[in-house]
A protein has these predicted regions:
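Metal-dependent amide/peptide-bond hydrolase catalytic core
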Residues: 124-214
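Alpha-helix N-cap/helix-initiation motif
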Residues: 1, 112-116, 177
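Di-metal (Zn2+ and/or Mg2+/Mn2+) metal-binding site signature of metallo-dependent hydrolases
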Residues: 1-12
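Transmembrane helix-loop-helix
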Residues: 14-16
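Bulky hydrophobic/aromatic packing residues
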Residues: 3-4, 22, 177, 214
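Residue-level recognition of alpha-helix initiation/capping sites
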Residues: 3, 50, 182-183
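Histidine/acidic-residue-rich, glycine-tolerant segments that coordinate divalent metal ions
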Residues: 6, 19-146, 153-158
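Surface-exposed charge patches
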Residues: 10, 57, 186, 190
Length: 214
């Protein structure tokens, strides 16, 4: 994205168009564009250091866009969906983010594993349960769910008592996004119950689906 912005600035400068402008153009790099490191950024929000998890809404809140009349965003895209060096995408998926914290019971994995409750087993079962939902996602809804484990235990000879997961739930429409999110929640809670663990699930609003109609 930064390279595209710089390229646009250089192109405007080379074309010598500045004399004909009645306003000004701002080449505006926005940090923290992606919703990543969700637990860390939620910590910043809870500490009062930020209000949002991504750069654009935070900058809107801070007034950085107050004197901007029109904004054009550039983003990298798939070569399959664009023709030439640049193009206008028909739509972009919306998404919401989820964090899951599985809580079990620590025990010595070699001496007394039966005394533990394995939170990693709950998390891996949840991953399988999420995967089992994929055939229920309609192709036209473009649903994408891609969880990761951000903490899977502490040391190898202790039954994991805490495991953390983050995931996006993406879809072409808000309805499909909420439907997929409900299935993910069901997988997370069902896996925890099956494993004897508890799970804390937090859902964080992301961005709404975007449909370019002009």
């Amino acid at each position: 994205q930064i390279a595209g912005m710089i390229g646009a600035a250089l192109g405007m400068a080379d074309a010598g168009l500045e004399d004909g402008w009645s306003g000004r153009i701002v080449y505006f790099a926005v940090p923290a564009e992606e919703y990543v490191e969700i637990d860390y950024r939620l910590g910043l929000v809870r500490a009062g250091k930020t209000s949002f998890l991504a750069g654009k809404p935070e900058l809107v809140k801070l007034g950085a866009f107050d004197d901007i009349d029109m904004a054009i965003m550039i983003h990298t895209g798939s070569a399959d969906s664009l023709e030439g060096a640049a193009g206008v995408s028909a739509s972009s998926n919306g998404f919401l983010a989820k964090t899951a914290r599985f809580l079990g019971k620590a025990a010595h994995a070699g001496v007394a594993p039966e005394q533990g409750i394995n939170a990693l087993n709950a998390a891996t079962l949840a991953l399988s349960a999420i995967h089992a939902q994929r055939e229920t996602f309609r192709d036209q809804d473009c649903v994408r769910v891609h969880p990761i484990l951000t903490k899977a235990g502490d040391i190898v000879n202790i039954v994991p008592a805490e495991v953390r997961m983050e995931t996006y739930v993406r879809a072409r429409t808000a309805e499909a996004m909420l439907d997929a999110a409900a299935k993910v929640d069901r997988a997370l809670h069902g896996a925890a119950i099956a494993s004897g663990c508890t799970v804390e699930v937090e859902t964080v609003p992301g961005f709404l689906p975007l449909a370019n109609d002009a």
